[in-house]
Amino acid sequence: MYERQNYRLMFWRDGVISYRRFFSVNGLAGIRQEDPLIFEHTHRTLRQLIAEDLIDGVRVDHPDGLADPFTYLNRLRDLIGEDRWLVAEKILGVTEPLDPRLAVDGTTGYDALRELDGIFVSREAEDSMSMLSLQQSGSTWDEAAIAAAEHTLKRDVAQSELAAEIRRLTRAIRRDNFSTAGADVSDEDLERTVIDLVAAMPVYRADYISLSRQTSTIVADMVRRFPSRRAALDLISAAFLANGEAKTRFAQVCGAVMAKGVEDTLFYRACRLVALQEVGGAPGRFGVSAAEFHLLQQERAMLWPHAMTTLTTHDTKRSEDTRARIIEITERHKDFVELAQQVSALVPAPDDATAHFLLQNVIGVWPVDGGTTDAVRDRLQDYAVKAVREAGVHTSWFDNDTHFEKAVTDWVDALIEGPASSMIDDFVREIHRGAVQVSLGRKMLQLIGPGIPDTYQGQEFVDLSLVDPDNRRFVDYVNRAQALDQFKESALSGRIHGELLQARDAATAEGHPGLYPHLEEIADRAKQAVVHEGVYLRRQHPDVFLSGDYQAVFAVGEAASHLIGMARGVSGLDVIALATRRPLLLEDRGGWGETTVTLPEGRWTDRLTGKAFEGTVAVREVLDLLPTALLVADHVEV
């Protein structure tokens, strides 16, 4: 029976797999969507859903894995029509533009996630966090270190997990070379040069027209630095000029190597500030300045107003609220240095770099009340095993070191049960109130900013989750629905301001610290209110957000840098969103002081509190009860 089959079973590590895989997953074979017949067969269900008018849009996962993303997306656009939403999970580099010729409304929003997270990072902590990382892991994980590690890990992935794909590519290069270039290049030299070229590519895929010079620039640089590779590079270039299989496979392999080497490996090794190690992230760049943030939002409003923006997805390595907690480490970086050193002394780890990476994630999901239940313990231990396998230093998915993995889970258990537990409790309580403020403000900016915001399941409440399967846990929608009904009732009856004032006074009387002592108690309701009001406003006035202008809003005064604001509108300004940056440092300086913000002409009402303002107002008055505000001009009907 076996002899009569048109295939032969092979060991995957021999590097002779003859079918295209989804990255390195042997059980997922790539389908040739470039074949019109296959496209028709695989899109029958989608065509039926479109015919029955059951869906409003389509999200395309990993288009960089396709042979021809342009043609595929054009066909898909023809299938679903011009009026339906079409977004692509295209992971962009920091300076990489989305090709405007693609038949999509934009990306799925990981580029926006980097911006929305980065604006809340306290950049003053960079040196301190770098030195701590150097002490704990042997690397500062700054931009240069990240770049070096990225190149090394991409080479490793190309030589191991994706060796079969590299060998298929080199064979295609030989076939597509119709010149005499590189005729004397050995297979070994060609393969080594291909690996180095793939590792040097700074983007997932460089055959988009907007990146047309990327490959030639890298090739020219390699010729200059490695003269001995000239013949091999001539051979590769000649093959690419044929516009055949080699060029296509090179583009596909680059994306797979980038994903496996960076997202799935490097981002589980680097440990300076793990909140920045997200899909589409740039952890070597320590945060985003206000100037960069505003310019990027304006660009999105002009070029991609219908792109998705996101903070949490099924693929993010941490939920938005977990990342907010970790981001707040930067506001208490000196305390964190002390905590990390104490934990290292009290609870020796099987590996210091692993421990430093895991400690930040532990802080991210540690219960603020210190109630580390068995469920929390299980979640953290499961995450730790997944993280060390992804990192691939001491164990991996293919070569499990059960002794090391047991040592890591025992270390997590010792954190929970041992003397370090109370220290983590204290630190988490200190940064949590800042994290909630970041969560609320960042959500507000996402909802009011350019693009179409996506709210992942359950994220309208504060949710402290890690990577899958942790972010696929049960969501209590009944509780959320009941809370939303209560909010609507309070809003309709005009009780919101009074209820917030009462909650603040009660929390102050109980001795809770901070500018918003009541925020921890009402965190879920506050975040849900932000989501509800933002989405409601977008639904009532889609033109303001889908085609409206974007303007930055700036404060004036000693605490001006702590305010990040934006205004949206059509033929004028209609909506203003304000959020608090670096809230704990603001608290340290005693609050907003005499800092002011000047509103456009007319009366502006905060949808969250019901308070109204005009002209130049003190920020402390606008953000009296909540660290974020959604101001709507009186001429806007709501």
Task: Enumerate the language-model features and the residues they cover.
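Short catalytic-loop micro-motif centered on adjacent basic/acidic residues
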Residues: 57-60
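Carbohydrate-interacting/catalytic domains
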Residues: 1-16, 20-54, 68-151, 156-163, ...
